[in-house]
Amino acid sequence: MSIQHQRVVELCNELRLGGVAAQYTALAQKAAEKHLSFTDFVEELLMAERESRRARTREMFARIAGFPAIKTLDQYDFAFATGAPRKQIMELASLAFVERAENIVFLGPSGVGKTHLAIALGYLATQKRYKTRFFSAADLMLMLEAAQRQGRYRQAMHRAVNAYKLLIVDEIGYLPVIPGGRP
């Protein structure tokens, strides 16, 4: 790497252009080999930066979602779980239900892939930059009960529930029903 290339990479890092910094040398070499115009070269650099930022945003959304593991629809065994028809799940994968603010409930016995499907749809939502949050019902209730004891129930509800475009609450069937409805 020439000293000038090194300075360009350092400047990119200083200006927080990590995508350009990571791709600069390879793109400069490609531009020289293909005799790209300066404008074409700059466009390639800017597209690399944009994609880098989008990837970081998707990673951040997935991290904030709090998934116990990353699951995808490609990993789901539709042959094993016959109660979830592929066509219906692929319809859900359009995430139109999120835009319509509709609820989706997966019902079935333990071990058929309800959590896998919920996480896979949630992960897909994070990749489309929807604010998404995953909770087990028990964790959500414990958090809300603690907030109520501290007099911060409304704030906790907003932070845990209302702030997200997609909220996934897993293992609801494992909680006892509490008279009064609120923790």
What are these regions (language model features)?
Residues G122-F135, E145:
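Post-Walker A helix-loop "phosphate-sensing" segment adjacent to the P-loop in P-loop NTPases
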Residues F106-G108:
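Hydrophobic anchor at the beta1->P-loop junction of P-loop NTPases
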Residues L92-A101, S110:
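Phosphate-binding P-loop
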Residues I89-A96, L144-L167, R182-P183:
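Conserved alpha-helical scaffold flanking the Walker A/P-loop in AAA+ ATPase domains
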Residues K71-A93:
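N-terminal pre-Walker A segment at the start of P-loop NTPase domains
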Residues K114:
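Conserved lysine of the Walker
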Residues V9, L17-A69:
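Interdomain "pre-motor" coupling segment immediately N-terminal to P-loop NTPase/helicase cores
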Residues L117, L121:
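Hydrophobic positions on the alpha1 helix immediately C-terminal to the Walker A/P-loop
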